[in-house]
């Protein structure tokens, strides 16, 4: 079984940029899915695929890919998704002392210089939910985005909530979470495994994810790897 992910990958999804370790939420989920499908850990091979390339149309180098891919109708035109393995919220992060650190509403962020990673729903959330006056900055990786924030090139970044907790607690001097964006129009944002369009494995992988949700495995892995994320105030 070949599993794809981005290069690099970040905690709490993968630890030490090593997807093979089984440490980090998505690494652990990938091995749990493999186990459900009858693959021993040794039978799992990992490949690295850039985020945007992984959801582009055309043949894939992987059977399934776990890189915090949010399920969307637009993406479904090019790839298949499994059942969702995680329900996600988007959050705004900045550094202490920034003029926008104390914002409590989405409207207060309209004047901010905001940034996000290319092709992500985090970036889309800036455009759709915040709609800032200035064009949002776009970065190839979260590392580039963090650097821009540290250097004062942007006021704030939008990332998924577990990533926000990790960046502000472990990677960004004086990093603070401004708050999480409201979940919006009733459709929850969820991460799913990406598969080739019309892959014969899609149904099996979805059944595996559903079984892991039903038997409590997903909940336990969330507690283990993402619980420290906790909650953040919701921006009104």
Regions found by a protein language model. Name each.
Residues 1-66, 77:
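Extracytoplasmic small-molecule ligand-binding "clamshell" domains
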Residues 53, 69-78, 127-128, 150-151, ...:
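A ligand-binding cleft/hinge motif common to bilobed small-molecule-binding domains
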Residues 16-19, 30-42, 122-140, 169-172:
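Ligand-binding cleft/hinge of the Venus flytrap
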Residues 2-6, 23, 105-120:
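Short loop->beta-strand "edge-of-pocket" segments that line small-molecule binding or catalytic clefts
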Residues 121-136, 176-178, 207-236:
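Ligand-binding clefts/hinges and TM-proximal coupling segments of bilobed small-molecule sensing domains
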Residues 87-94, 161-162, 169-210, 228-236:
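Periplasmic-binding protein-like
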Residues 44-56, 101-102, 137-151:
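Short helix-initiation/N-cap motifs at beta->coil->alpha
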Residues 83, 95-113:
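Flexible hinge/capping segments at coil-to-helix
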């Amino acid at each position: 079984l070949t599993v794809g992910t981005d290069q690099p990958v970040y905690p709490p999804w993968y630890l030490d940029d090593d997807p093979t370790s089984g440490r980090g939420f998505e690494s652990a989920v990938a091995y749990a899915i493999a186990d459900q499908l009858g693959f021993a850990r040794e039978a799992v091979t990992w490949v690295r695929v850039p985020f945007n390339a992984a959801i582009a149309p055309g043949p894939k180098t992987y059977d399934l890919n776990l890189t915090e891919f949010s399920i969307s109708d637009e993406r479904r035109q090019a790839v298949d998704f499994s059942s969702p393995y995680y329900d996600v919220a988007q959050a705004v992060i900045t550094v202490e002392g920034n003029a926008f650190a104390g914002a409590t509403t989405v409207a207060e962020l309209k004047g901010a210089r905001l940034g996000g990673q290319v092709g992500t729903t985090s970036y889309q959330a800036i455009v759709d939910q915040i709609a800032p006056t200035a064009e949002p900055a776009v970065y190839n990786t979260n590392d580039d985005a963090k650097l821009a924030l540290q250097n004062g090139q942007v006021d704030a970044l939008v990332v998924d909530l577990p990533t926000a907790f990790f960046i502000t607690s472990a990677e960004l001097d004086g990093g603070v979470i401004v708050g999480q964006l409201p979940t919006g129009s009733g459709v929850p944002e969820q991460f799913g495994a990406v598969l080739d369009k019309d892959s014969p494995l899609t149904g099996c992988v979805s059944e595996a994810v559903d079984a892991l949700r039903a038997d409590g495995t997903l909940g336990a892995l969330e507690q283990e790897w993402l619980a420290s994320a906790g909650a953040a105030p919701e921006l009104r």
